[in-house]
């Protein structure tokens, strides 16, 4: 049943969009001649539901401050059967961007759309797809992507995705693309200042006239700076082609605002300051350039009205770590990104914001560097991280005054701090409510941050390999800051899944610049391993990953180098034993370094290390495709070579590997079970 036109008008007003209502099909009534040069960022659509979708373009004008465009939506690419026609304003106040909500559409239907100015100068033609009805039993297909730093590479993955989708059977074509953040990188390098990083060429993206410089990075501090970056990114032809082919469903990660920022604090390396106005500017630019059903701060249809804020210190926090300073609250609430999408019978997608409401980084105190130290190449004792994550609530409210590593003792910097939260109290309550209300076969949590533990077992290192011994029976963590080390919060969520008997729970995420597949579990051995769902991380589209950094930065004389890299003959890429370390442990790595015998190395796998992992590739790039049915969830990783230069091939270039992870729907009380199969290529040490 379609919503009424009156209800549709209220929805359009709530999300700050112009609107059009579909009617009977008729021929086009406008003059139109394609002039892509006048629409330099292309066209896009976003957040489809069963009867509507948001359309977007940017058409800058040299004269005046406000102009009108016409948008048409048709059932055919030739616009013989036009079902919607409306005028929409573009203005200098919105950087000449347009958002149009088209309603009255048919469910699970493909449409074509285009924009035109008063002189008949037209945009390229875009294609979009509405969602199926909530009771539609058809299979759901979508892709999830993240981390597209075109300052340091090219978007060959999108071209591969388009090439394959155009040739896929209709029932297997993608319905939408879920973008899990780092759509832009606010840390911009200039090619005339730094020509390369690692083995990558630095490409021109934007110039930040009003920003701040940290090292080689230029960082925006105003909306004009963020807009310049979006315009530079959206000049990429492969990104334009992808946005013109599918509706995108997007949520920001950190780089849409600030690299190491949280709430409205700007932080990039040594640069840290209150950034309430910067957070508002980042939200405004995101709102202007990504079509999404997100709530703006004003009731206007045409623009984001930024709330007046001042950059003042945030000194008072509530019991959950939320800064109570009024400008901070105004800034982080200037745009609410968390939302849901129902897509047929088989998908309830719940999307969360991992940066606007999170507490301060609980692992950043400099004194903690003494725990493990540089000798262990970034390994940090898991028990110590759990103490820090738990804050004042650790051990039933009795956290230790000190944290120990062998004979080293440091004061517990989180003893009086709240337990770490990534979601914040209000959003977490909303998320838990949505999870319990979800009725689709699969309840998929779309969040930008990975949730699978990244740990190793240095307690099994041979005696004497390092100057200091690692504590017995103590696992190590190799990253922090995402849900992989947010034990308190994720346990709360996973316990809800188990206690509410929720089946078909799965997480899709990004940010880590690597491929991961495994299980959502609150604890790992020696705790009780009880997975309640599936968990996947998609690799970066472009951005450099862990292995690329280690190839250039890992000390060559470290006795622990074989745990991460095994060097080969000159000119050949090293073997990435870091994948083995996370999946199988130090004994497997050292055996592989000695013998190059992968089967023998796997025979030494530590069964208590990573029962939650089925696959990990810290050197992967590409995208993931998901297929959901009544019976199973199928997640396919498509990995491409490092996208350092643009491929000249229509298919985006070669594939490194294609691997699929399949799980049948489980009943309440049962454990989910993944089956992994390599369809083509070589996954190396990832399994």
Predicted regions and their residues:
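N-terminal export signals
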Residues: 7-28
């Amino acid at each position: 049943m379609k919503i009424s036109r009156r209800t549709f008008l209220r929805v359009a007003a709530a999300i700050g969009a112009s609107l059009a209502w579909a009617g009977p099909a008729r021929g086009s009534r406008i003059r139109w001649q394609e002039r892509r040069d006048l629409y330099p960022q292309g066209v896009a659509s976003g957040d489809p539901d069963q009867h509507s979708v948001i359309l977007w373009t940017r058409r800058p004008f040299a004269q005046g401050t406000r102009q009108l465009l016409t948008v048409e939506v048709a059932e055919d690419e030739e616009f013989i059967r036009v079902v919607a026609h409306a005028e929409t304003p573009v203005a200098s106040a919105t950087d000449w961007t347009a958002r149009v909500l088209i309603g009255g559409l048919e469910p699970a239907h493909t449409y074509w759309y285009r924009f035109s100015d008063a002189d008949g100068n037209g945009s390229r033609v875009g294609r979009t797809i509405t969602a199926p009805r909530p009771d539609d039993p058809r299979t759901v297909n979508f892709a999830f992507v993240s981390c597209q730093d075109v300052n340091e590479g090219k978007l060959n993955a999108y071209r591969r995705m388009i090439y394959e989708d155009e040739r896929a059977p209709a029932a297997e074509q993608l319905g939408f693309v879920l973008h899990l953040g780092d759509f832009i990188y606010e840390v911009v390098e200039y090619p005339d200042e730094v020509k390369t990083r690692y083995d990558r060429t630095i490409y021109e993206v934007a110039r930040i006239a009003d920003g701040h410089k940290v090292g080689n990075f230029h960082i925006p501090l105003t909306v004009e700076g963020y807009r310049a970056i979006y315009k530079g990114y959206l000049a990429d032809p492969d990104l334009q082609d992808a946005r013109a082919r599918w509706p995108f469903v997007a949520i920001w990660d950190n780089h849409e605002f600030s690299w190491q920022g949280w709430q409205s604090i700007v932080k990039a390396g040594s640069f840290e300051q209150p950034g309430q106005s910067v957070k508002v500017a980042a939200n405004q630019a995101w709102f202007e350039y990504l079509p999404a059903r997100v709530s703006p701060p004003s009731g206007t249809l045409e623009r984001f009205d930024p709330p007046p804020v001042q950059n003042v210190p945030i000194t008072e926090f509530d019991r959950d770590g939320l800064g109570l300073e009024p400008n901070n609250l105004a800034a982080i609430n200037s745009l609410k990104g968390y939302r849901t999408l129902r897509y047929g019978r088989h998908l309830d997608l719940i999307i969360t914001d991992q940066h606007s409401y999170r507490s301060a980084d609980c692992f950043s105190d400099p004194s903690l560097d003494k725990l493990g130290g540089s000798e262990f190449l970034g390994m940090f004792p898991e028990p110590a991280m759990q103490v820090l994550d738990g804050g004042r609530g650790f051990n039933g409210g009795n956290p230790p005054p000190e944290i120990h590593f062998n004979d080293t003792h440091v004061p517990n910097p989180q003893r009086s701090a709240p337990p770490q939260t990534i979601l914040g109290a209000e959003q977490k309550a909303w998320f838990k409510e949505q999870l319990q209300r979800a009725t689709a076969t699969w309840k998929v949590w779309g969040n930008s941050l990975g949730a699978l533990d990244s740990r190793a077992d240095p307690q099994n290192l041979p005696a004497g390999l390092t100057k200091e011994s690692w504590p017995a029976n103590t696992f190590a963590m190799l990253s922090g800051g995402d849900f992989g080390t947010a034990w308190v919060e994720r346990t709360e969520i996973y316990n809800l899944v188990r206690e509410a008997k929720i089946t078909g729970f799965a997480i899709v995420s990004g940010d880590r610049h690597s491929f991961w597949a495994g299980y959502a579990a609150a604890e790992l051995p020696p705790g009780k391993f009880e997975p309640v769902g599936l968990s996947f991380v998609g690799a970066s589209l472009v951005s450099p990953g862990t292995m690329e950094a280690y190839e250039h930065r890992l000390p060559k004389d470290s006795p622990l180098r074989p745990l991460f890299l095994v060097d080969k003959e000159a000119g050949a890429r090293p073997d990435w034993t870091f994948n083995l370390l996370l999946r199988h442990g130090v004994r497997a790595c050292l055996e592989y370094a000695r013998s190059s015998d992968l089967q023998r190395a796997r025979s030494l796998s530590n069964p208590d290390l990573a029962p939650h992992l089925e696959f990990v590739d810290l050197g992967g790039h590409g995208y993931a495709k998901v297929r959901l049915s009544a019976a199973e969830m199928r997640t396919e990783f498509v990995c491409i070579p490092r996208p350092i230069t643009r491929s000249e091939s229509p298919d985006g270039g070669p594939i490194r590997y294609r691997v699929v992870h399949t799980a049948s729907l489980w009943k309440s009380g049962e454990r989910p079970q993944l089956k992994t199969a390599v369809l083509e290529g070589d996954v190396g040490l990832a399994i």
